[in-house]
Structure formats: C-alpha cells, structure tokens
C-alpha cells in the first residue's frame, strides 16, 4: 500500500487540508474569512462596489444574490452578516417550509426587541412558491429581518414582484479561468 503525500490523511502530517478525519468539509475550510479573500466580485465588493458601500455606510438592505453555482453567494451572505454584526440565520428553500420560516421570524423578533438584528439567508429562494415568498413581506417591511436570498434562476421570472420590489438584486459573476488561476497562485 502506497503512503499518501504529506498533508493527506495517513501521511503523518496532522491538520492537512485533505485529512480524512478533518472536522469540516474541504470547501468549508477553504471558504474566505473576509471580503478581501473573495475573488471575482469586485463590481460588488471592491472599493466602489455597491455592497462595499452598503457595509461601509451601515445601510444594509434586503437583497437577492443571483449567480451560478459556486460563485460565492453563500459565502458573501455569511461575510455580510459578520461585517454588519447581524445574527446569521441560514435556511434552504429546498428543505424548509412555512413552519421553519415562522420559527426564524419569532427568533428574529425576539432579537430585534433586544436590539439585535437578524440576517436571514435563504438559499435557493426561487424554490419557495409565491405564497411562501409572500411570507417574507411583513418581516422585511418592518425591519425584523434583513433578507438575503440566493438564486441561480432569473429573479424577475422566479420571484414575485412584491418581494422583488423590497430587495436589491445583485448579479454575481461566474468565476472565469483567470480568476481561478489568481486564486490558486
């Protein structure tokens, strides 16, 4: 049996990125820790980017992040929550329903009454039907939550107009070869 290279499980080096018993998935361990580590989205988080200005001015609004798989929607939402001091509540529209939303809304309302804000991140938000999407309206309008919805589908076709009118839509770039090369070097 061949010996794995150093840094790989069984290679004698603990803490390697590819270690079999590592506590978190590789993608999670490599996830950017702050906005300076995010690649390919300078139009949003660069010095003149819309999201950068929102964060710098502490004027965060509800938004929809639209982009292909792997472009950084979830990572960006986590970093926005950390940078804004809001409690991050992640949900997947694939695995969640109205009951899950109500629980999050109740926790967010309790936090709000205590002076703490909540950022609700909904992955695959386009998977919620129109009635479920309407459930966000009162809590977005009254400031109970800041909503960040992530979608790979065109929000103009997949999200209802009432929700879209209360959110800014940001388009995330696909990571091209040059960007991926830059990330590796």
Predicted regions: what they are:
Residues 159-185:
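Conserved AAA+ ATPase core "coupling" helix
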Residues 52-56, 122, 126-155, 161-165:
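Conserved catalytic/switch belt of AAA+ P-loop NTPases
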Residues 44-49, 86-119, 130:
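Short glycine-rich substrate-engagement loop in P-loop NTPases that contacts/grips substrate
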């Amino acid at each position: 049996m061949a010996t794995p290279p150093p840094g790989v499980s069984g290679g004698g080096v603990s803490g390697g990125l590819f270690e079999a018993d590592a506590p978190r998935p590789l993608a999670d361990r490599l996830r950017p820790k702050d906005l300076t580590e995010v690649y390919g989205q300078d139009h949003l988080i660069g010095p003149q980017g819309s999201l950068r200005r929102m964060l710098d001015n502490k004027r965060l609004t509800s938004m929809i992040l639209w982009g292909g798989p792997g472009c950084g929607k979830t990572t960006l939402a986590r970093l926005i929550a950390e940078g804004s001091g809001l409690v991050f509540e992640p949900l997947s529209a694939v695995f969640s329903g109205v009951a899950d939303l109500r629980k999050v809304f109740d926790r967010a309302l309790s936090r709000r009454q205590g002076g703490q804000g909540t950022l609700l991140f909904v992955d695959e938000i386009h998977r919620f039907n129109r009635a479920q999407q309407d459930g966000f309206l009162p809590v977005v309008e009254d400031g109970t939550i800041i909503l960040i919805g992530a979608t790979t589908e065109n929000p103009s076709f997949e999200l209802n107009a009432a929700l879209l009118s209360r959110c800014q839509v940001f388009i995330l770039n696909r990571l091209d070869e040059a960007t991926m090369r830059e990330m590796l070097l």
